[in-house]
Amino acid sequence: MKKVIKKIALAYSGGLDTSIMIPWLKEHYEHAEVIAVICDLGQQEDLDTIKNKALKSGASKAYVVDVKNEFAIQYLWPLVKSGALYEDQYILGTISRPLIAQKLVEIALTEQVNAVAHGATGKGNDQVRFEYSIKALAPQLEIIAPWRTWDIKSRQEAIVYAKAHGIEVPVTPKAPYSRDHNIWYISHEGGVLEDPSQEMPDDVLLMTAPVSQTPDEEEVVVLDFKKGVPVALNGQELSPVDLLNSLNQKAGQHGIGVADIVENRLVGMKIRGIYEAPAAAVLYKAHKLLESLCLTRSTLHLKQSLQQTYANLVYEGRWFSQTKQALDAFIDVTQQHVTGCVKLKLFKGNIIPAGMHSPYSLHHPELATFEEDNVYNQKDAEGFINLFSLSAKIYSQVHQEGNYD
C-alpha cells in the first residue's frame, strides 16, 4: 500500500529550483501541507522576502533558521583545520548541505511530518549530500526529490513553470546562472559557463574584483590562530561570522580567491564552475604556513596524505559518517599546537607571506643556519646516510651480480 503523504518539510531557498517546489508538491500530493525551512547561511539575501514568497506560494509555515555561527564553528573551522581541497582546487562551499539537512530534519521531527523534500537536480551532487544526511539522521522520513520525477527537464522549462504559477525568480533566459551563496563562498554554474572553452564573462563575479580593477597598493592582514582555528584579524578578536565577512571584503577587493575549474561530480560527469572564496583562500594559506612551522615532518606528511580523503568525504556529503569522525579525531590532535600569528600581503590576486611566529615553532635558527654553529655536527650525517641508503645499496649489489631469487 502506498504511503499517504500528508505533511512535507521542504528545504527552501527561494531560488529557481525550490521556488517551484511548493505548488508542485501541493499538486502532486493531494491535500499535503508544505512547511518551508530556510537556513540563514550568510547568503546576504532578504530572508523575510523569501519567507513571504514561500507563504504566498502556498506553504502553511515558513521557518527562518539563523545557522551562520554554527556553520562557521562546527563546519568551516574543521574544514580549515583539515586543509582539504577537492581535487586540489575546490574550496568545498557545499559543506553547508549536511547542516541544511540537519535543520530540515530537526523541524520535520518537531512538526511531525512524514516526508521531506529538496530542490536538488538529478544530475548534481546535492541530491546525494542531502539524502545521505537525512538517512543518517532520520531514516524513517520519506524523501521527495521532484527533479528526479517531474516532467521539467531544463532550467528554461523551470522558468516557464515558475512564470505560469506567478512565482518570481531571480533568473532570466539571457543570464541563467545558477548561484549558491553563503559566508564561505559563491558558486556560479550554467549558461555560457557550461562551455570550458569560453572565458568567464564580466558579469559573473559578485564578491571579488577582477584583477584589472584591484588597488595598486598591497594590503597587510594579520591572522591569529589558536589550535588551528582563526580567532583574530589584525589584532582584533572577532566572532567567526564577523571575521569571515571582514576578510571576504578585504581579500575580495584585491581579486583573491577566484577559481575557474572543471570538477568531477560524484554522479559521474564533469562540470565547470566558477567559485569565489576570498576569505577561505586567505585562511587556507595562513593555516598552511603556520602548520609548516608547528608540525613535525611525519605528522605533516601524514595529514597531507589524508586531505584528499577528507575532501572527498565533504564533497560527497558524508559529514555524518564514522570515517569523518575518525579523521576529525586525528586532525584535532595535529592542531593542538597550531597556535600563532601569520602576516600576509594581499596584492593583485596574490597572497604573499610576510612573516609568522608561534610559541610552538619547531624551527630553530641555530640548527638551520648556514653559518658556523655549535649545535649541529655535520659529521653525524655520514652515518645516517649510510643507514638510510643501505637498502638501495644492497638492491643494486644483488642485481648487478645477477643473483636473483
Curated annotation (Swiss-Prot):
It catalyses: L-citrulline + L-aspartate + ATP = 2-(N(omega)-L-arginino)succinate + AMP + diphosphate + H(+). L-aspartate binds at T121, N125, D126. One of its GO terms (biological process) is argininosuccinate metabolic process. The keyword ATP-binding applies. It is found in: Cytoplasm. GO terms for molecular function: argininosuccinate synthase activity; ATP binding. GO terms for cellular component: cytoplasm. ATP binds at A11, Y12, S13, G14, G15, L16, D17, T18, S19, G119. Pfam families: Arginosuc_syn_C (PF20979), Arginosuc_synth (PF00764). Its EC number is 6.3.4.5. L-citrulline binds at Y90, N125, R129, S178, S187, E263, Y275. Pathway: Amino-acid biosynthesis; L-arginine biosynthesis; L-arginine from L-ornithine and carbamoyl phosphate: step 2/3. NCBIfam families: argG, PRK00509.1. Homotetramer. Belongs to the argininosuccinate synthase family. Type 1 subfamily. This is Argininosuccinate synthase. It comes from Legionella pneumophila (strain Corby).
